[in-house]
Every structure is written in structure tokens, then in C-alpha cells.
Amino acid sequence: MAPAPATTSSSKRSKKRKQPVAPPPESDSESEELSYDTAAADEEEGEEEAPNQMEELEEEQEEEKKEKKQKKEMSKEKKRKKEKGNEGGSGILTNMLFSELGVSEPTARAIREMNYTYLTQIQARSIPHLLNGKDVMGAAKTGSGKTLAFLIPAIEMLHHAHFMPRNGTGVVVVCPTRELAIQTHNVAKELMKYHSQTLGYIIGGNGRRGEADQLAKGVNLLVATPGRLLDHLQNTKGFIYRRLKCLIIDEADRLLEQNFEEDMKQIFKRLPLNRQTVLFSATQTEQVKEFAKLSFEKNEESTSKPVYVGVDDAETNATVEGLQQGYCVIDSARRFLVLYAFLKKKQNKKVMVFFSSCNSVKFHAELLNFLQIECSDIHGKQKQQKRTTTFFNFCKAEKGILLCTNVAARGLDIPDVDFIVQYDPPDEPKDYIHRVGRTARGEKGKGEALLFLLPQELKFLIYLKAAKISLTELVFNENKVPNLQSHLENIVGENYFLNQSAKEAYRSYILAYDSHSMKDIFDVHNLNLKDVAASFCFKNPPKVNIDLESSASKHRRKMRKVDGGRRHGISAANPYGRKGGDDKRQFARF
């Protein structure tokens, strides 16, 4: 109670100092105060009540100012709510305020400091169910606010259950990639700023012993990748998880794509069945539905069924409104020249460029930096510390160029990305959606996306259109594309390390192209290898070991493992893959 008067008096003094520069409407009353104060100083000793009257007058004026300020703020808030109501919710936001959720004060305070006011569609439709302890399966576009949708109820559950470190882990969040796990942990850290509960993350690439020590001390909210979580469940004796209350699975479709299904089955067997389960996925496929059945398994006496929330089923576009999308048709031989010209012009912007292989990312990063176009790179062959540092540096940067593989295509919230360039086309439409989802995120988010296509790949646009993705053709001015081919060939030919890197990138590009699931479009035998070699700065195709038969066999084994031998089932009528036999809808959505 003691600090309150001190704060009040200090605010009074500061306001008195600011009075001489107050706005005109208040200057009249201010001059009256000053003249009254001067007159009071000249009064006789018999008029001792004047100072008290002056203090009372000041207090009345302060109260009037506060009331006016409060009324002004209330009117502004009402106006904003009215505008929201007239618009029916702008973009992904609704008219529902976070202050209406009724969460605990520590959580509410953290949300205010994170400057969140209105809930998104997925948050408004899922958080109330989750706060009531329901199981939820959610589907929403990337960048729609799914992370807050599952973290806020989870933190509230820990708070009301009075979880302490000695109680062990109460919430587990499973993420498909290390970067997404770290990012989710950082969001949870902000939300739990005023809570007493503990949190941590365990991911591949980090020291296992340090993680085991952390788990033994008690981690109430744990973010993990599947492989490392299963490792600790099997081998870490000090890991207390018998009181687990909630399991959250983020980006379930990506988990399945990365063949984590068997790991997840083993995780389900070890975790308590009497728990709340939350599953979020950007796309809904038959495989995700089957996986959901395993995820929501309960004890026999449990009769509750999960609540299904799909917020974009009626949308006419599979991508967000603020995204401008285009494609350009370029021969293999000129692909890099066009990319170079584009990036040179956009060096003051924030750009992400997607490639099909780690070696291709590595080579192009080395070459572009050699050509004085500064860029960073992220791919799966890097050590975790390098990936993490690069990722957070790019997040903080106002401008920059990041070259990456699909490791950066899902879930990551990178602020203010201006351009997404898909130098190598994605494997299928849903991968396209997730790549472009790195830009135009959140309410009123804006960004641009550019897809490079070879002339024989134009049929891919039919599949994109079937997936509710419309692109505009862009034509590059040939006069603005520099004629550097011979110069680039000399650079790569004379630099041993660049030459070796280029050979590996060339080989990986061909193998990645051969592994495309949509072989009616991406047929490796239709490639002009001399032109492909030119895009990697070779005059003639280099001598590299390319065993396409082995690569094809590996791809067939992968398909048998992923889809029970039925292959992908992708077609123009069903760009998301095979559906169940009784499913008559074009898209398997909830």
C-alpha cells in the first residue's frame, strides 16, 4: 500500500510542470490557477484558508481531467468496436476482445504487454472450448494465430491446477521442427512472464544431458520435437510426466510428412490417456484424420468427443488476402541470372528464397555472397546452433535475404517478410501454401510471392488453381537481366571450393527433381542438362555420380511407407492427395 501515495504525488508534480505547455482549452483554467496562486501569496496572514482552497481546486481539476481522459478512451474503444462490427471482422480478426476471455490476471497482463487486443477466427472458436477442458482438432491457414490459441488455455490450466516444479510436466507441445519448437517456447515464455510455473524445450541437436537435468528439476510446460521427446520418455529416469494434463500437437500434417508417425504412436503409448488433447494442422487430409483418431484415444470410460474447428472451409482462396502472387516462366539457362537481378534490386527488402536441396542452398549462398549480395542460409545439414542463430538474426533484421529449404517453410513466424521467392517449385500445392505463408502474416499483413517455372512445368498452375490458388504471370524485362554468364562460369571454374559446391548442388538438384511426386509435371527426363548446368555456372554438364534408379527406388519405398502403398493420389481434382472411399468432398476439410 505504501508505494501508491508516492506514485500519485509524483504524477501530480509531473503534471504541474507540464501545465505551461498544455493545450489552449486548458490554458485558461491554468492561468486562473497561476493568478490565484500569486494573489494568495500576497494575502494577509488572516486568510490562511487560501492554500487549502487551492489544493482542493487542483484536485478537482485533476479529477475532471482524468474523467475526460477516461471518457475519451471509452469513446475511442466503442468506435473501434463499432467499426469492427460494421465490417464483420476485418481479415482474420473477430470482434471478440482478449479482455473478454476471463483469463487469470498474470495471463491477461502478459497479453496486454504483447499488444494483442482482438482474437483471430481460430482463437475465438477454439480457446473457449479449450478453457472448458474439451479436446479440439483445429484447421486454419498458416499465420492465423494457432500458437496463442493453444498456449493460452494450456497456461491457464497449469495456473489453476497450481502446478509446481515438483509436480513435473503438465503440458507437452510437440512441434515438427526445431525452429518451430524454439519459437513456440519463446511465445510461451512471454505469456508466462508473470506466472510461477516453469517451462523449457527439448530438441535434437542440443545437449541431451543438460535437457535431462532440466527435466529432473521439473518443467511444467514442455515444448519438444518428436524424436527427442520419445528419447527422454524412454531413457530419462528423472522425467516426471505421470500427471500430464494436456498434449498439444502442432502442425500435425508436417509431422506425418516427416515420417514421425511411428514416434508419435510410441509417445501416445507412454503418456497418460486421461488427458486433454489438442491437434492443429494447416491442411486436413485422410492421413491426418487417421492420425487424429490415435491422438484422441481415451480411457474406456471416457465418452467425450473432440470438437472440430475449421475456420477457412468457406474461403475462396487458400492463401491470405494481403498476399500478391505471381509466377514467371524462365528457361533453365537463365534462371540464376534472373534471380541475381531480382535479389540485387531487392537488397533493401526482407526476402526468403526457397530451394529444393541443402547443397543448392549452400552453393547459392556462397556464390551470392561472393558477388557482393549479402545473404544468409538455413538448411537441414547445418548444426542446430548455426540454424538457430541465423533464424533469430533474420527475424530481428529489418532487411536481408535468407536462402532456405522447406525446413523454414512451416509454422515459423518471421516478422515483416516482403517477398517469398520459390526458385525451385514445391512438391505439391500444400507445400506452396506453407512457403508463401511466411509473408503477409497476421491482420492486414501484406507481402508478395514469386514462383519460378520452366516452360514444361506450366501444368502445375492447374493444380494450384484447383487448390484455390490464383497466380498472375510476370514478365521480366530482358534488358534488365545482366549478361554475366561467361563471367560466372569463369568465377566457378577458377575457384576450387565454389566449383565443388556447384557440382554438389547440380547433382542434388537433379536428384530432388527426380524425387518429385507429381512426375507428370516434373519429369527429370524432360530437363535439358546443358541448360541446367548453365544455371549452376557451368559451360557443360559436370561429371557427377547421378544414380536416378536408386533415387527412384528410394522414392517408391517412401511412398509405400507414407501411404500404405497407394501413392500420393494427387490430381487436379484433388490437389491435397488421396481421400477415404466414402469421402465425396473435393477437399477433406473440417
Curated annotation (Swiss-Prot):
A motif (DEAD box) lies at residues 250-253. The keyword RNA-binding applies. Residues 1-92, 551-590 are annotated as: Disordered. Its EC number is 3.6.4.13. InterPro entries: DDX18/Has1_DEADc (IPR044773), DEAD/DEAH_box_helicase_dom (IPR011545), Helicase_ATP-bd (IPR014001), Helicase_C-like (IPR001650), P-loop_NTPase (IPR027417), RNA-helicase_DEAD-box_CS (IPR000629), RNA_helicase_DEAD_Q_motif (IPR014014), SPB4-like_CTE (IPR025313). Residues 335-488 form the Helicase C-terminal domain. ATP binds at A140, K141, T142, G143, S144, G145, K146, T147. A motif (Q motif) lies at residues 96-124. It comes from the Eukaryota. Residues 127-302 form the Helicase ATP-binding domain. Residues 27-62 have a biased composition (Acidic residues). One of its GO terms (biological process) is maturation of LSU-rRNA from tricistronic rRNA transcript (SSU-rRNA, 5.8S rRNA, LSU-rRNA). It catalyses: ATP + H2O = ADP + phosphate + H(+). Residues 40-87 form a coiled coil. Signal peptide: none annotated. One of its GO terms (molecular function) is RNA helicase activity. Gene3D superfamilies: P-loop containing nucleotide triphosphate hydrolases. GO terms for cellular component: nucleolus. It holds the Pfam family CTE_SPB4. The Q motif is unique to and characteristic of the DEAD box family of RNA helicases and controls ATP binding and hydrolysis. This is DEAD-box ATP-dependent RNA helicase 27. The lineage of its organism: Eukaryota, Viridiplantae, Streptophyta, Embryophyta, Tracheophyta.
